[in-house]
């Protein structure tokens, strides 16, 4: 009997020690999971079996808690979203090339030729500074290349046959193909390309090209019709009188008739 009591007492002590170990291990699990960032599953224990919560369950619980507060502030947030929109953070590890375009200055402290900001929403303008025209400290925004060919010069042709200068050589150092001579180097040392203007106090005198002035042309005579007709009749009468000097006696009718008949009869035979 005493041996059976000792065995029962030992079993009870073992069961109590096992329960104590289980409770201590569960408490350690709770503390370790609560100290984490909350991204993994969370173990909750009730009186019965333990329950494991997945991230979807935690998101549902958070959505139920914040639904009431988000509904009240959604209207005000939408009104201010168009005016105040902050750029989201871009990780350098994922997009290294795109992130390098966001730098406003280069390593030497100069502004780059292009500055680009990505368009994350329609309310943000993409280009803030835009294209720069300074290359190595030289302004090249209004320069033209000698090899540049416009559409007018090459329209409808496969070869560039039109010379923009039409074969005229360069006359002066200021005669350059640039739009503005101010951007050319030392343009003021070449002098003026046009002759200077001469101002005088005297009156203006017109100078003729020739010594003989041009005279007005004589008037063309314009006679009436009856005078022209009278002159034509007079010319015809004079011509008829002149032809009388060459007048000849006409041939008699019968003589001519018989002569023509005899000739026709001989031909028929």
Swiss-Prot record:
<protein>
    <recommendedName>
        <fullName>Spermatogenesis-associated serine-rich protein 1</fullName>
    </recommendedName>
</protein>
<keyword id="KW-0597">Phosphoprotein</keyword>
<feature type="modified residue" description="Phosphoserine">
    <location>
        <position position="75"/>
    </location>
</feature>
<feature type="region of interest" description="Disordered">
    <location>
        <begin position="1"/>
        <end position="92"/>
    </location>
</feature>
<feature type="modified residue" description="Phosphoserine">
    <location>
        <position position="82"/>
    </location>
</feature>
<dbReference type="InterPro" id="IPR029165">
    <property type="entry name" value="SASRP1"/>
</dbReference>
<dbReference type="Pfam" id="PF15160">
    <property type="entry name" value="SASRP1"/>
</dbReference>
<feature type="compositionally biased region" description="Basic and acidic residues">
    <location>
        <begin position="1"/>
        <end position="14"/>
    </location>
</feature>
<feature type="modified residue" description="Phosphothreonine">
    <location>
        <position position="54"/>
    </location>
</feature>
<feature type="compositionally biased region" description="Low complexity">
    <location>
        <begin position="67"/>
        <end position="86"/>
    </location>
</feature>
<feature type="modified residue" description="Phosphoserine">
    <location>
        <position position="72"/>
    </location>
</feature>
<feature type="compositionally biased region" description="Polar residues">
    <location>
        <begin position="18"/>
        <end position="38"/>
    </location>
</feature>
């Amino acid at each position: 009997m005493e041996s059976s009591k000792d065995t029962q007492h030992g079993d009870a002590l073992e069961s109590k020690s096992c329960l104590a170990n289980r409770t201590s291990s569960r408490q350690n699990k709770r503390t370790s999971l609560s100290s984490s960032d909350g991204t993994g599953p969370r173990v909750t224990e009730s009186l019965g079996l333990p329950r494991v919560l997945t991230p979807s369950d935690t998101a549902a619980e958070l959505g139920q808690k914040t639904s009431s507060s988000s509904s009240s502030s959604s209207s005000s947030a939408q009104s201010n979203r168009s005016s105040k929109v902050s750029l989201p953070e871009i990780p350098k590890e994922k997009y290294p090339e795109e992130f390098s375009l966001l730098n406003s200055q280069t390593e030497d402290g100069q502004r780059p030729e292009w500055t680009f900001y990505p368009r994350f929403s329609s309310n943000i303008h993409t280009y803030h500074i835009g294209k720069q025209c300074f290359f190595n400290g030289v302004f090249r925004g209004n320069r033209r290349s000698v090899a540049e060919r416009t559409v007018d010069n090459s329209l409808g042709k496969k070869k560039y046959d039109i010379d923009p200068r039409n074969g005229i050589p360069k006359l002066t150092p200021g005669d350059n193909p640039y739009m503005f001579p101010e951007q050319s180097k030392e343009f003021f040392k070449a002098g003026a390309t046009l002759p200077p203007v001469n101002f005088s106090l005297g009156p203006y005198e017109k100078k003729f090209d020739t010594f003989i002035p041009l005279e007005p042309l004589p008037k063309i005579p314009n006679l009436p019709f009856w005078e022209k007709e009278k002159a034509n009749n007079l010319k015809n009468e004079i011509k008829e009188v002149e032809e009388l000097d060459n007048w000849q006696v006409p041939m008699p009718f019968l003589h001519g008739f018989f002569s023509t008949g005899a000739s026709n009869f001989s031909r028929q035979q």
